[in-house]
Amino acid sequence: MKKPYPIIVMTILSFLSLNSSAQEVIRLRSCEDNSIIKQADSLKNMYANDGFVLLKEASISMESEYEMPVVVPLNQGSWYQFVFIGDYTSKLYEVRMYDWNEKQVVFQQKRWGDVDGNVISYSYIPKFSEFHMMKPVQVNKQKKKNLCGYVMLFKKAGQNTGNASITASDNKKSNL
């Protein structure tokens, strides 16, 4: 008598693979917005004057209400400054940062109309040398796609800069 288990297992796996391939994935694409570039240049000068070195920067094309995960290796005890600049027409800007254990270590939110509302900037000194994930998101009711965002990672000068790199990973819809 033949065992039905292999057939059942194969059927379940085929359904799971169909379901997972149907999910939308947003790929990292750059964008260009002159007002964001001017803001980024101004912030780069300000942080350079404060003794920070720019490790990485990237312009990213985003969709409204979708997170754009950015993964970076951070060194224990080093002082980092992370900056996210969103499209000035968006109504809400948010950044969450998680450590390797997926514990949320930073949360910042700004709304349109706040002073520097489209810029979120925060300092962070990691307790461990490990990868961290930043998840910037912006909400825009008029433009759903092709929102420009800009991320920058700075490190306090005089500290080992290592090989930090910004990497975008697959996106999941924000829980707003």
Label the predicted regions:
Residues D116-F128:
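Beta-sandwich interaction modules
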Residues F107-D114:
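Solvent-exposed serine/threonine-rich low-complexity stretches and specific carbohydrate-binding patches
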